[in-house]
A protein has these predicted regions:
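Surface-exposed loop/interface segments of Gram-negative outer-membrane beta-barrel transport/assembly proteins
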Residues: 1-25, 61, 65-169, 187-243
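Outer-membrane beta-barrel channels and translocator barrels
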Residues: 38, 49-50, 86-90, 179-181, ...
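Periplasmic N-terminal accessory/gating domains of Gram-negative outer-membrane beta-barrel systems
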Residues: 25-36
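A beta-strand signature from Gram-negative outer-membrane beta-barrel systems
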Residues: 1, 38-40, 53
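Outer-membrane beta-barrel architecture
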Residues: 42-46, 82, 173-175, 179, ...
């Protein structure tokens, strides 16, 4: 139907490719989607005595994306430590510490329909994934339908910008409680939250058609770090009367 529309409307053709029957019947969703396995490991250890206890946990998650194959993934390593101990009758201490390392990468999805899913919906099945006779488009098949959004989804994923990000985050708190007398308790609590981000984007130059091209390669890098802390001190007195 899309081919007939282009023929009947007598519009200029994308890349100059004729709208004659091609003999192809490409399943574009089958071409762009892939199985995305998920691997996750968890280890938890508990330690304790009559003075207190600690819990240490480790987690590793590795998930591939359903689009982009090796170019799309999410990896995370995280650890957590919770502990509380009574030093003596009037002093107790504790800590809650968390750390995470995240690495993720993916094919740029863009906005306003400029992404592989949108292209797979819109491109006609008569376009082949690859065209060995088309050296000027790097061997990718070009749709005969004259619309800028008729981008070959495989070409888009191969040539579109690739993003790779690394995020590290540390947050936690340590505290101490001092019991001066039976009903009077002082607590000091110090917490911190630190996040560090590094991102990199690479967009290669390419020519897919007159409407789908990038004349220059681009590299963008960004870094961001922020920290915050909070220190709380409270004095609590609790007394019951009339019991």
């Amino acid at each position: 139907l899309m081919k007939e529309f282009a023929d009947n409307d007598d519009m200029p053709l994308a890349g100059g490719v004729p709208t004659a029957p091609t003999g192809y019947n490409t399943d574009w969703f089958n071409e762009i989607l892939n199985t995305a396995p998920v691997t996750e490991h968890n280890i938890t250890a508990n330690f304790g005595s009559d003075k207190g206890s600690s819990l240490l946990s480790l987690n590793y998650l590795d998930q591939n994306g359903i689009i982009g194959e090796d170019a799309s993934f999410y990896k995370r390593f995280s650890t957590r430590l919770n502990s509380s101990y009574s030093i003596n009758d009037f002093l107790s201490v504790g800590a809650n510490v968390n750390y995470a390392y995240i690495e993720n990468s993916g094919v740029a999805t863009g906005i306003n329909g400029y992404n592989p899913i949108s292209y797979a919906y819109n491109i006609d099945p008569t376009t082949p994934v690859y065209d060995e006779n088309s050296n000027d488009t790097f061997g990718y098949g070009v749709s005969p339908v004259p619309y800028s959004r008729m981008w070959n989804p495989i070409a888009f994923m191969d040539e579109a910008p690739k993003n790779k990000n690394i995020t590290q985050q540390f947050f936690g708190n340590v505290y101490a409680e001092i019991t001066f007398i039976k009903d009077l308790v002082f607590r000091t609590d110090f917490g911190i939250n630190h996040r560090n981000f590094r991102g990199r984007m690479f967009a290669p130059k390419f020519f897919h058609s007159a409407e789908c091209k990038e004349d220059n390669s681009r590299v963008e890098q960004s870094t961001n770090a922020n920290s915050s802390w909070q220190w709380e001190n409270t004095l609590r007195y609790k007394k019951s009367f009339g019991e």
